[in-house]
Amino acid sequence: MSVGDKSVVFLIGAGCSFEADIPMSSSMIEKIETKIEKESDWANFRELYFYVKHTIEYGSKLGGILQDFNIESLLVTLHHLSEHRQSILYPFISGYSNDLIEYAGRNFNNIRELIKKVEEELPRWITKSDYKAAEYYTGFDRFQNEYNYPIRIFSLNYDLCIEKQINSNRLETGFADGKPWDGTRFTHSCDDEPDAPIYLYKLHGSIDWERNKNILICSQQQGIKPEIIFGTGTKVQAVDPYLFYLYEFRKYALLSKIIVIIGYSFNDHHINDLLRQALEVDDLRKLLIVNPYELNNVYGRVGVLSTDERIIFKSVGAKEFLSSTLTVDYLSKILPDEEMPF
């Protein structure tokens, strides 16, 4: 078969940056709870926070929903509560529980204040003064040189591990020369020579993105309000680059022969739906799941039977996988001979 630049697609989640000392979502929850218990300016949110947390957990168990409580489920719930009057369901709701009304404060102001405090902390937790621990991300660069075709990395992370470890002239992010984000930088005709061999699509935003009057720029300044989104309900926004990136992920997932998934917990229903669709339309497409920990019901979340041999697990961390395991030969051995793109 012909060899192109679309046979391998990468999808990375928080676990990919864990060994670079970037806290995962569950660790951020621990940080919030420590602040609530130990810092006076957080203490007033204690009852509200734990009420929301326990209600989310109870609702998940009651509905049989496989959803971990994490920073995203917390924030998407708080955002929905803060905007409850804009919901189409608002006229049907006779009232909220007395506990929620008490903890949320007048006009739900406490909810908005808690959102503000959490979102102010998030960039501090993710930003590193030194990205040396993320050196293993250069494995993407090494693989691309061996593969000899452009690669596409779809990231669910807000951190800058890739940007700090891969030379900017080899990495396409949609930004250049201080100009606003431009989606056309990701699209080239068959006759065009791509400007960079590695394309990075940050599906949930980035801590160095800033939006001003609907203009998205990449900022080097400290203390900006980063353009990041949370939770399934808010991730599908009718605004670029989010819609464009989701379209691109669907497009290249459907064109790929193997989707390499590193450190993703399968908690995003929209992403899971796109993975499910990719499996449904091609009986030979593979999912290679790189994670050192056992994941809860991956098969069910992507809509396949537990006997489906297209789902392949590699029980190592991202550091080991990117540093030594990921090679053209390794991926070639996973694919059937007639489907090898190399």
What are the functions of these language-model segments?
Residues 15-16, 158-160, 204-207, 266:
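Short, flexible loop/turn elements at secondary-structure junctions
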Residues 1-20, 25-54, 193, 247-342:
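SIR2/sirtuin-family catalytic core signature
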Residues 234-246, 266-267:
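A general structural motif
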Residues 195-198:
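Beta-strand-turn-beta hairpins that frame and shape the catalytic cleft
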Residues 20-28, 41, 114, 125-136, ...:
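Phosphate/oxyanion-binding active-site loops and adjacent basic polyanion-contact surfaces
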Residues 207-233:
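Redox- and metal-dependent alpha/beta enzyme cores, enriched for Fe-S-associated oxidoreductases
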Residues 2-4, 11, 20, 54-193, ...:
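Active-site periphery "cap/insert" segments of enzyme catalytic domains
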Residues 9-13, 152-157, 174, 200-204, ...:
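A structural signal for short, well-ordered beta-strand segments and their strand-loop junctions
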